[in-house]
């Protein structure tokens, strides 16, 4: 479950939306999505190389710690963002009725939730949803490099720890007799949790804001790190009897 409740699939699925909200524009957000996939592939190969050299436990602990820190870094970056439209910006917006946004020009917002709420109220949900990337690019003042770095580190840490290593670990924890059904049940729960996270993620961004959403995921990762630190055995080179003895003790 820790795999999914850190928000990994939600971040992948809504990567373009997240990057729009950083204010880097629609085209750049698509390019950043490609970058995420590339980072994931590279660090998965790193995990394959290291898993039998370092062991499962160190990779999972290092990766989970990195996930927690990177998510909290994203949260901090979003919390420092401000949102402000100037009158001169309105002429650069490509959609009709952009002049309606004069009502909020020169007003500085310290919450993305309040800014988006006012823009939606003025333009309507339909116009906003079609032009949100353009509006946010104009209005957002944020350390985009900091947030982008946080997201890339998050993807990298997941790709060499919770992503591939957890499945190797699970295959070594269960006896052959129960391995198939156990991993099947875990896969089902994993997919179910992933679907639920992806369903609530857009609501979180809209209702709670970017900073609080990433903070929640970061705290979950911190808790996950300490749980793994406490109970996770090293399975490398150990028999089921040895693992059972370790877990019982």
Predicted regions and their residues:
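Alpha-helical transmembrane bundle of multi-pass membrane proteins
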Residues: 1-249
């Amino acid at each position: 479950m820790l795999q999914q409740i850190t928000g990994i699939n939600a971040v992948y699925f809504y990567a373009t939306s997240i990057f729009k909200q950083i204010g880097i524009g629609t085209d750049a957000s698509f390019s950043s999505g490609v970058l995420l996939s590339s980072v994931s592939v590279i660090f998965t190969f790193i995990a394959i190389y290291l898993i039998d050299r370092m062991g499962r436990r160190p990779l999972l602990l290092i990766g989970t710690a990195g996930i927690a820190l990177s998510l909290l870094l994203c949260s901090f970056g979003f919390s420092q963002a401000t949102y402000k439209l100037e009158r001169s910006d309105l002429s650069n917006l490509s959609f009709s009725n952009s002049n309606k946004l004069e009502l909020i020009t020169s007003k500085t917002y310290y919450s993305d939730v309040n800014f988006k709420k006012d823009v939606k109220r003025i333009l309507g949900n339909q116009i906003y949803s079609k032009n949100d990337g353009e509006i946010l690019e104009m209005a957002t003042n944020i350390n985009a490099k900091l947030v982008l770095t946080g997201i890339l580190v998050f993807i990298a840490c997941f790709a060499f720890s919770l992503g591939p290593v957890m499945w190797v670990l699970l295959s070594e924890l269960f006896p052959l007799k129960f391995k198939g059904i156990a991993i099947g049940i875990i896969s089902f729960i994993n997919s179910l949790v992933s679907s639920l996270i992806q369903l609530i993620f857009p609501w979180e961004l809209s209702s709670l804001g970017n900073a609080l959403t990433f903070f929640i995921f970061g705290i979950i990762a911190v808790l996950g790190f300490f749980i793994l630190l406490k109970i996770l055995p090293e399975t490398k080179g150990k028999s089921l009897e040895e693992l059972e003895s370790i877990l019982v003790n």
